[in-house]
From Swiss-Prot:
NCBIfam families: PRK05170.1-5 (NF003501), PRK05170.2-5 (NF003507). This is UPF0260 protein RPB_3505. Coiled coil: none annotated. It comes from the Bacteria. PANTHER family: UPF0260 PROTEIN YCGN.
Length: 170
């Protein structure tokens, strides 16, 4: 039986293709983040099925316009349930969006055209419609836990059509 040849990727040779997640420097690791801020949205888990539901409610530290944390360096101290992504947990966190750079690299997949490491432009994540910019309706300080169910949305778990393109639209 003949082995199926490995598909050649135009990204072969880049650090995320040549290093394991554990071998990456801190700067390389951080650069895998595309800046979408979808992971900073509040999520609910169905206790029976384990299914994750995203909301359009942001963490109290999320700047929804910049798609960045107001206090990234101290986020874990200020938000005790903030999940720090690590090489170990990105392989098992089921709620990471399908577009997440950490998830894609952990799965051995290529980054999308709009990822800043590919495009060279941190704004392409917004241009592609992947980020939360303009979609965060409130922060967790404005919505009670009991009311989060009323804020469930499906878009964070989906990839926008233009983000699926092979290259930046014309």
């Amino acid at each position: 039986m003949t082995a199926v040849p490995k598909k050649i990727s135009p990204q072969d040779g880049f650090f995320w293709k040549t290093k394991t997640l554990e071998e990456m420097s801190q700067a390389e690791w951080e650069s895998l983040c595309d800046g979408c801020a979808r992971c900073c949205l509040e999520k609910l888990e169905d206790e029976d099925s384990g299914r994750i539901y995203f909301t359009h409610v942001g963490c109290r530290l999320l700047d929804g316009d910049a798609c960045a944390c107001h206090d990234y360096a101290n986020r874990s101290e200020r938000v005790p349930d903030c999940v720090r992504l690590t090489p170990e947990n990105v392989r098992t966190l089921s709620w990471l969006p399908p577009s997440c750079g950490y998830r894609l690299v952990a799965e051995g997949r290529d980054l999308y055209w709009w990822h800043p490491l590919i495009s060279g432009d941190p704004n392409t994540v917004h241009d592609a419609g992947v980020s939360v910019r303009g979609r965060v309706e409130a922060t967790e300080t404005e919505v009670s836990v009991e009311d989060l169910e009323d804020h469930i949305v499906s878009w964070p778990a989906l990839l926008p059509r233009r983000a699926k393109l092979k290259k930046r639209p014309g």
